Structure formats: C-alpha cells, structure tokens
Amino acid sequence: MRLPLLLVFASVIPGAVLLLDTRQFLIYNEDHKRCVDAVSPSAVQTAACNQDAESQKFRWVSESQIMSVAFKLCLGVPSKTDWVAITLYACDSKSEFQKWECKNDTLLGIKGEDLFFNYGNRQEKNIMLYKGSGLWSRWKIYGTTDNLCSRGYEAMYTLLGNANGATCAFPFKFENKWYADCTSAGRSDGWLWCGTTTDYDTDKLFGYCPLKFEGSESLWNKDPLTSVSYQINSKSALTWHQARKSCQQQNAELLSITEIHEQTYLTGLTSSLTSGLWIGLNSLSFNSGWQWSDRSPFRYLNWLPGSPSAEPGKSCVSLNPGKNAKWENLECVQKLGYICKKGNTTLNSFVIPSESDVPTHCPSQWWPYAGHCYKIHRDEKKIQRDALTTCRKEGGDLTSIHTIEELDFIISQLGYEPNDELWIGLNDIKIQMYFEWSDGTPVTFTKWLRGEPSHENNRQEDCVVMKGKDGYWADRGCEWPLGYICKMKSRSQGPEIVEVEKGCRKGWKKHHFYCYMIGHTLSTFAEANQTCNNENAYLTTIEDRYEQAFLTSFVGLRPEKYFWTGLSDIQTKGTFQWTIEEEVRFTHWNSDMPGRKPGCVAMRTGIAGGLWDVLKCDEKAKFVCKHWAEGVTHPPKPTTTPEPKCPEDWGASSRTSLCFKLYAKGKHEKKTWFESRDFCRALGGDLASINNKEEQQTIWRLITASGSYHKLFWLGLTYGSPSEGFTWSDGSPVSYENWAYGEPNNYQNVEYCGELKGDPTMSWNDINCEHLNNWICQIQKGQTPKPEPTPAPQDNPPVTEDGWVIYKDYQYYFSKEKETMDNARAFCKRNFGDLVSIQSESEKKFLWKYVNRNDAQSAYFIGLLISLDKKFAWMDGSKVDYVSWATGEPNFANEDENCVTMYSNSGFWNDINCGYPNAFICQRHNSSINATTVMPTMPSVPSGCKEGWNFYSNKCFKIFGFMEEERKNWQEARKACIGFGGNLVSIQNEKEQAFLTYHMKDSTFSAWTGLNDVNSEHTFLWTDGRGVHYTNWGKGYPGGRRSSLSYEDADCVVIIGGASNEAGKWMDDTCDSKRGYICQTRSDPSLTNPPATIQTDGFVKYGKSSYSLMRQKFQWHEAETYCKLHNSLIASILDPYSNAFAWLQMETSNERVWIALNSNLTDNQYTWTDKWRVRYTNWAADEPKLKSACVYLDLDGYWKTAHCNESFYFLCKRSDEIPATEPPQLPGRCPESDHTAWIPFHGHCYYIESSYTRNWGQASLECLRMGSSLVSIESAAESSFLSYRVEPLKSKTNFWIGLFRNVEGTWLWINNSPVSFVNWNTGDPSGERNDCVALHASSGFWSNIHCSSYKGYICKRPKIIDAKPTHELLTTKADTRKMDPSKPSSNVAGVVIIVILLILTGAGLAAYFFYKKRRVHLPQEGAFENTLYFNSQSSPGTSDMKDLVGNIEQNEHSVI
C-alpha cells in the first residue's frame, strides 16, 4: 500500500510553519478503551487515552519501526519468543527485534512471527509479546477506525548536505541529544536539517529537509521570463522514482520541458555540470507513450542521437549537461542527480473553457462542445495538407485537443470508431521536434500511443493522427491519405437558447438512450442518491468506455473536484455494486484505487478528469443523475435458452458466464504473465478475471479437485499506468477485489501484474510480470477452445559441450553445488571465465528466468564485490553502471556482507558474507579459450609487509593487545583492522593457525578473530567473507564453558592467549568484551621481507630461547649428543607457542623431527630430558602408542612415538624477545567558509566538488582560494577513505588530484608531499602529454590525462589546532572572518596564483613546474570546531550549491 508523506510538525521549529503532525498517533484498544503509554524506557503500559500526553504518542520511523515520541526510542523485544516484555530500545534499523508489521486490520506483530502486541491477558502491567490474538491483541489508531499501518513511514529525501540526497534517519543524535524531526539546532540561519544516519556525532552525514523554511527559496532558480522555479540537485544520487518523490515532497515535480526557451534556460543553468540529471519524462505506462510525470504535454523533443533506446527497462529519461543538455533514456534504477520544477511555463494567455455547456451553436452535421463545433470526415481520405485546406474552407481548422475532456467528447459523441485513423492539427512542420496546433492555439495536452512520438527510422513524421479504441496519437508522414477531424469556433454571438433534447426534461443532457443531470447541491452519497430518486432517476451508472468518455466531457471541465457516481462497496466490503440492480461492466480507477477501505465512488475532474476515487460516503460532492430517455425502447429481456455448457475439463458456476481452467505446471513449463495471457488468448479466451465471490469459489473448487494447494496462479490483473489502477486484461471491470493484507504494494516499483494464492483465502498479490507462475485461463460458456499453442523453442537456449548456456555474446554456467565465493570464483577462472557481471535489465531477466525454470537454488553468487568502504566493483573489472538491489539491500549486516547474490525468485540482489555457501553463475565471452585448454599457472610475485607486521603465506598479520589500552570489543577491533586496509584475521588452515599462535607467545590476553555468528545463530562465518574450511575450537566450544554468559550472546570468536595449555585454540565470547585482536592484510608486492634473524651458528631466536633445526637424520641418542656438542640440548616444547614455532621450522624440510620427550630413559614415563616438567602435550590421536619410546614432531604438528633407533631430523635448543607500537591519532577541526562542507580524516580536511567541473589548473586555483591545495594521497587508508566518499558520485564525474609530472618526467604532489603511495589504474601512467592525474570515482584508481580535461576535484588542507571549546566559537561569520587565519599571505598566495594563471593563459606546465620547485606552502584556515554553525548572512543559491555542512567525520577506526 502506498502512503502519502505527511511532512508536518506538532511543535514550533525555528524557521518552520506550525502544523499538526499527523504522522503521530495513539495506539488504542477499542474493546477496553485504553491507549498504550510509555511510562519509561523499561515500562510500556496502558492508560486512559490522552491526546495531549507525549508518553502516548508514537510514530513510524522506518517501514517497520515504531518510535515513542516522548523518549525517541523504538518499541522492541529481547527475543522472538512468547510472553516477553515489549519495551523501548535505541532505534536500530538492522535489529530483527524492532521490526513490526500489521497482520490484519487490528493485529500488530513482530515481523515474520505469529507473536502479537498484547496487554492484559495475565494481569501484567507491561505490554507483552504474545501468541494469542484475542481482544487484548487488537489495536487501532485512537479517534479513527484506521489500523496502525495507515500512518506508515515514507522516506524523506534530503537536499544538498554531504550525504548525496540520502533519506533522513529518525531519530538521529546530534551533540548527544536525540532528534525525531528536522531541526535547526546548531545553525544560526534557521535552515532545517537532519542526520542521514542515526549517529550524526560519529558519522557527520546530513542534508537539508525538503520543507518550507526561511531561506529555502534560495535553493531554487527562478526564470525571470516565466517566473518558473527550478532546483538543480546535482549533488544527489537517487533513482528516478526516489528523485520524483523528493520533488513531490517540496510540492514540486520532476522537470518537464515544453518550450524551447525553457530548454535553452536549463542548458545554461546546467552548463557547468557534466553528469546526467533525472527529468520527469518516462514511458512507464503500459497503455500510452512518452509522458511527463506532471502531466504536461509532451510536445517538445530533444533526444540525444540514438535515443530513445528501445532496450527493455530503459523507461526513464535524464538530461545530460555534458552532452549539450540532450535527453537519453536510462534504466530507472540508476542513481543520478535530478531537477525539480515549480510553476507553469506557458506564456500564452489562452484559457480553456471551465464548463462544457457554454453557448454553442453549430452548422448542420457539426457537433457542439464547449464553444466549438466538430466534424469527422471519415470517408474523404486526404493527405494532411489537403485535409487542413478543407477544414479552413469550412471556416475551421484541423482539430486541436486541449484536455482529456475534449478528447473524450470526440471519442464518445462525434461518432469516432476504434478502427479510425484520422488527422488532427498537431504537427512539427514549422520547427522540427516542436509540435504545434495548426490553429495556433497552445499545446496544453497530449495523449500519445505506446512508443510515440517516434519519428520512425529518422523519417519526417511531421504530422499526427489519432487512432485505436482510445483515440491516442501517433506521428506519421504527412503524405498519407487519411480521414480527418475539423473544428471551428461557434458562430453564435447571442445568448444561449436552452434546447430541450428529445426524451429528456429541461436541464438534462441526452446521450444515446439516457438523460443525465448534474446535481448542483453538495451532498453526501446517500443524499445524492435520494435526490436522484426524487427525480425518478438514480445516481449514474457507467456501462462502457464511451459512456465514461461522455461523462468525462460532461463534467470534466467544471471547477468542482468530484462528482458522485452510483458505485460503492458499503454493502459488501471489496465488492462494488451500483445503487440499482445492474451488473458492473466497466471501471475506470485512479492510481492506487480502489484500495482497502470501503467507501463510495466519485469521478474526478481536472487533470485526472474521469478517473474514479473511493471516498468516505459522508463526504459532500456534486453528483450526476441518470434515467432512461422517454420514448426509447428498452432492450428486450433476453429469452430463456438452455444455459451453454463448458468444455469437459473446464469449471464453471451456474451464476457466471465464464469457464475456467487451471494450468498447474512443473518448473520448466511455468510462464511469465505475458506468456500466460498470450497462451489463453490463443485458446480464444484470456487470463482469468474474477468479478465476484461465485467466480472465486469456482476457481477454488478447481484447485481442491486438482490438489493444487498453495500454488500461485496468474490472473488477468495488470497495472496499466502510474495514473490508473489495476485493470483486467479482458477489459472487464475491477468491481471485486481480494488483495492480501498490505497488497498491492508495488514492491521495488516493478510489480505490475496480479497472482492468486491457491489456499482458502484465495488472496491476490501484485508481483513482477516476468516472474514464472502457473496460470488460469477463461473462455465464455458455450465456446469451444482452440488447440493449445506449441511451446516456443526459445525457452531452451543452446548449450556448449562443457555445459555452458549461450546467450548473445556470452556463455553462462549455472552451478548446482553450493560453494563459498572464493571457491566459486576459482571454478569460473579455471574455465576461462569469472563470476557473472550483469550489465543490463535484459541480461538480468535472462539469468533470473533461466534459474527459475531450471530447478533453481534460492540464491546465486554474482561477480559484484562490496569493499570495506562500501564501494561496488565487478570482479572482471567491468564498470558498475547497473544494479538491481532488493528492497533494504545492501544492508551491510554486521558490516561483513561483501559479496552479492541474486535471488532466484525475483532476480533482485542481496549482499551476503562471501563465506556463506551459495550456488553461483559463471560468465565467459564466446571468444574465450576452449575449455579443454590448460589454464596457465600465474607465477607468484614476491611481496612483503609494512614494518611491525608479520609475513606469512602472502599475507600480513599484526597482533594488538599487548598494551591494555589497545584492547577493543569485536566491532571496534574490526574497524581498526579495516583502517589498516585489511580486516580481522580469517584462519584458513593449520599452518596459518600455528603462525599466529607462534606470534602470541608473550600475550596475556585472548585475541579477536573475524569468526562470528552475529547474522545467523550457530552459523559461524569469517567477517572478511572467506569460507570456513578449518576450525580449531577449544574443548567445550562453541557454546560450552559459560558461567553467567548466555550462549546466544557469545557471537564472536577469540584465539585463546596467555599462559594456557589451550593457547591458540578458539572460543566464542561476547562481542562487547575488551580483547586483543589480530589484523590481516594482503602483502604488498612493493615491499620485501627482512630475513629471519639467525645467529652465526644457525640458531633462530624465539622467546627466551634459540632453536636450530638440524637437517640430517640421526637416531634420538645421536641427536641428543650432537646438540650437546653445539652447546645446546635437544628441544623441549613447553607450551603451544613453542610447538607452533617448532612446527613452522619444519615447513620447508618435509621431514619428521625428534624432540626431547622420552620414556626410554625414565622408567617408561614420558618426560623432558632437559628436566622441564611436562605441563603441555600435543599428542596425535591414539598416542602415545609405545610404552618405552622417543617422541617426534610429525608433519601435521602433532607428537608421535617411535623407537629411539629410528633416524629423523632433530631440533636443538638454547635461549630472547621483541616489542610493538601503534601510531597516535591527530587532533584538530575543519574550517567553515561560505557553506563549503569539509570532511575531516586523520590530520586533514577534504572538500569534494562534483557539480562544477574544472580543468586541472582551474581546480588548483579553486582549492587555493579556499586555503587548500589539490589533494595529495599519501596512504592506502587515505585512498580508501576518498574512494568511499566519491563512489556514490560515479555517475557524475571523476576527480582531479594534486599529482602532476614535471618537465623532467618526475611525478610530484602540488603541496610538496613525498610521493610515497600510488594507486594507478591498469595501464597507467601513460602518454607523453598526459601530465595531470585524476581519480576514478567508480574504482578509486588513478589515471594520468591531459590537464585541459574538465573534471570534479578534491581539495585538502591540514586540520586547525584550536583549543577553544565549541560554545565559544558560535559567533557570526563576520566575527569568524576577523579571526580567520586561513587567508593566504600575499607573497605566498601570489606565487601560487601566478603559477596557475600561467597554466590558465596557456603558458603551459613548464612555467608552472618552474614555480613549483619553489615549494610554496599553503597556510591553514581558521573556522568553527562545530561546523554545523555557519552564521552566513545570505543563503546559497544554485550558483553556489556546494555541500553546506562540514566536519563530516569519517569513522577513524574504519580506515586506519
């Protein structure tokens, strides 16, 4: 169900208008007359209802969370179990224990469970979660009959700020205070803002609210010629539907362009931008052509060459400033900026008549309507020019059509026929792609056919026809001989003579066999019906499209909004009936109608003229009465004939005229909605339409007879247009509904077809039309069905010899086995492919439909990766310019869902931990190497680690926690590791475990690993997404050896440390415990590893001892003697650390090794021959086997016994130690200047400009103007931070950075930082003249390009060190400027400006590099510590639409 946004507030907010907040409600139990009362966060009870009590007010703050207005906390439970208390918790959108849903009109329950919101069953004071659904579990909104979900949440999209248009997160925390509404707190200019994450204090992400407040008009640009206002949201990144909603939240719409002047103005307004911006043009309607979302006429075309593309799914249009502001159609799910519009661009004073019954007198054979006369010339076929000449000779012109009412008049009263194709006056002969009426009147209305206007095949289709049953329009070549419609003004100048039409009384209007009268008194539905009855008439019925067209033309031009018809469902909810005993044969619902609430039906006027809405029956409106005209012969009653029969295997009821048949098929034979409809039509029928309960019961009997319980079947329901509701494919009226609760909801804006669930409820659901389902056909009784059509061969695409499916230029492999992502990708690579990258809607549909038809697993890995900084990348390097996320995804659950799967039931995508086994899809090009060829082995590349990190198996590891202050909880530890460019350790095998144990020798703590079961209890996964192929649980773990800790709370895993014989083993622990932790990163090919410290005599230090592996085979006693000769002893292994070290020493020898344990010398008791007590052992299974023997360390790391006269390598032992440190964080704050948003990270502040592109020199100058320089990137952490910040802007631009090449060919940073880190794209740097460097927003990699290119840019400056408290800094901007030390000194800044001016004036980089060598340093800029305080004297306009709030602090732990 779609819910309107109610952006109004209950209290005065500075700068806002005082309005009642209708989002708030009281939760009311009608049976017991009590309301829910939040007494405290731990006590949610009931009390006598009091609308003024804050403690009783609640509000939806997400699709599934309910917040207490008093406490700014959300209703939740500790677990999903029966009879637990419902209390208040800090709102967490990811918590399953805070997600609520309406189960029906009264039941509220925890999502996904039959556990309900309950009070009073067992005399508890608190509200409880309870399995019962009795009277105490039934709730409404106080003062209404509405259910709790009727005041549902709708996202509020932000403007400007630094969150790319993200939605407000309510409640959000600012300066340790929670806000449930937009606020001006922290701002002196009164601008209303919100946080876009729940914790602004940490994340520093925000935007301005789409509300009216003082200064908000400065967000708009007003065209001085037309007074129309435009808002350019270039910094946002939203889908088309999100962008439209954002405009609507400001009482505006996505841009429509109807005049050449308007396009010219907008071209200039967006000239400095380079990325596409959504506009309102779309082809989302199934039944009509290109249209503007604000219903403006589509009369001006400005397509980019090659557009509009006919590719399926590209239904929304963007204006591309980088391509001369031309238009191109794209998939609506792409994320772009957008343009909103307020006002009307029409410059003409033309007035559409406000009534249809103005005085009109016409010549013979002409028909009057609203002051004009009309005539169809159907039989005189003429080319457009000759038709125009004929109309003008008759005193008129080819018809112009200015409203839906006028179009409906032509269809219903002028004798128009469905097979007509008639010239109208619209054409673009005078100005190509700019349609005008030949009579000179302005174009105020268009109604194009699907795919029109087309200018097909670049032909000159300059003239327009109307055709088809609905009279919609298409452009055609003007030389076709066709019929035509003429129109002229009424010739009468005198007062109207009211004519009484034959068969009707005075004041009534005749149409065909009926008389109609407009009731001029505002009345309720019952009053209107009684008034009509008093006139021996009844509230109007509407029998078909043509009567609807007549009534639209009859009342549509009137100023009143609604006119009652005789339709309602007040007798039986969901079944609409006329007030007279007449069958409902036609419906014409408005969008989202008829909905779930019972009511009475009224017909709209105005821009939605003729569409039907369901209103409360006690509302007052005017109405239309109807009766049979006098003298009209009523149609004879049908003669009684034997009822026709249905075919043998079809079902019917005696009260319906239809026969139905189920087609319940196997997975391979199911069909899409369109395929099912075509199948039924090939039989001579259609998909089933259900018009009453009798027909529904007939279908239920067929389901029970065939045993098709719980199967899903297509019905003929389809959503024809965004401006209309559901219709039946056979054209029958939607007079009966049986939607499931909460349906139709148009999930993800792709659910346009209806299905029926084969259970006793027989409920309906809207779903994607491309889904594969069973289906139900219908035919008329007495009709013999035609033979069933032969299945199309395209359902079985060709397959290669090795089992890959061929589709277009690629081959695909669909696995039946489940693997981790690493294993899945390895399989694809071995077969010369990779995990699939999906580049378009059509490719996704192919994959989705294939897995649906072929025994699909529930989900399949695809090749999309999500990095730790939430950037997206295809594994094969393809650009990410198409995504198809499921609702609420990606949700980055537990921050470790870095892989992506495609759901087989919908085709939408979900982020998931890479280590969770799934099926997968591989992809390779048709030209790839034959699969029988051996895949070449890539040579290993030498690599190393940073200082302080330990290298092993091409990875780097570091253990933290040796100092108490280093220890963290699991989440903090993971953030710290991510900040190093890695993650918490994932241990893949015994050798890696031994390496880590070896390095924990001096620990006194246990250390976090990446293993956890946070997302799914008892399913342990590595947080970096690697598969769980090895475990090393300690005794009793996981889930054992708890004291007061509950099993459910122990979700994270540590390696046991300290002086324990189980050191190195794993145990699960509570994630918020403070522990050490182990970070892991990839090794760096640019680094080398220092050799192990080996003493001159071949011994290696470890702990307080030194060891030497003797690589010669001796018997045990010979080995002991040899060690003594070398001033050592045969090695004892006293703890798990030494065991790990010793085993690692054997790694390259592949030989067994004697150790000092022996029972041969000590009366069959195993002891260490160096006299250490045996406190630790690591026996293999079934060991020790021998009573009197010597012990060796085997290749698997375990101890085994052997006769002492066998010969093995041996380990000698003698006796030292090593420390570790961690770098400190840097303090400071960022400046505020002219609404420029600086983003802090470590010791610097960054400004990202994506809307105004510059060449490299201009960008340098812009940064200098702000007291900064083009960014220097000096570490992987800094690179990751910037990549994360610019990735949402990838649809807009790439960004200049401060790296350049001087005349000597040396790469230098503009601020003289050393070039110690680079992140070149593959194949870069390249080109002799490409001397400046840009960062790719989509990948974070760098490319060197020509300095004259226009890009966005990133500025960087040091943080300001200022010890003043925040409250002392809340001064005016004037005060700020007085103390602002950021202005560059004239001598320093002058040099830099001269350098850049040389570049700008063509003196070239050579001169610039000359000045560069003089090492100009930029001074710091002063500003406020709390950068939400701006204190500007004027608000920014579109000409300066830079991000308006600074200090958006990236979480330090996430990137360091």
Curated annotation (Swiss-Prot):
Residue ranges of domain C-type lectin in the record: 225-341, 369-487, 511-626, 655-778, 807-923, 952-1080, 1102-1213, 1241-1356
Name of a matching Pfam family: fn2
Transmembrane segment boundaries: 1390-1410
Residue span, Fibronectin type-II domain: 163-211
Residues annotated as glycosylated: N104, N344, N529, N926, N930, N1160, N1205
Cross-referenced InterPro entries: C-type_lectin-like, C-type_lectin-like/link_sf, C-type_lectin/snaclec_domain, C-type_lectin_CS, CTDL_fold, FN_type2_dom, FN_type2_sf, Kringle-like
PROSITE patterns named among the record's database cross-references: C_TYPE_LECTIN_1, C_TYPE_LECTIN_2, FN2_1, FN2_2, RICIN_B_LECTIN
Residue ranges annotated as Extracellular topological domain: 19-1389
Subcellular localization, as worded in the UniProt entry: Endosome membrane; Cell membrane
Disulfides per UniProt: C35-C49, C74-C91, C168-C194, C182-C209, C247-C340, C316-C332, C391-C486, C463-C478, C532-C625, C600-C617, C646-C659, C680-C777, C753-C769, C828-C922, C899-C914, C977-C1079, C1052-C1071, C1123-C1212, C1190-C1204, C1263-C1355, C1332-C1347
Keywords in alphabetical order: Calcium, Cell membrane, Disulfide bond, Endocytosis, Endosome, Glycoprotein, Host cell receptor for virus entry, Host-virus interaction, Lectin, Membrane, Receptor, Repeat, Signal, Transmembrane, Transmembrane helix
Subunit structure, interactors included: (Microbial infection) Interacts with Dengue virus.
Matches recorded under PANTHER family: MANNOSE, PHOSPHOLIPASE, LECTIN RECEPTOR RELATED
Protein name: Macrophage mannose receptor 1
Species whose genome carries this gene: Homo sapiens (Human)
Lineage, highest ranks first: Eukaryota, Metazoa, Chordata, Craniata, Vertebrata
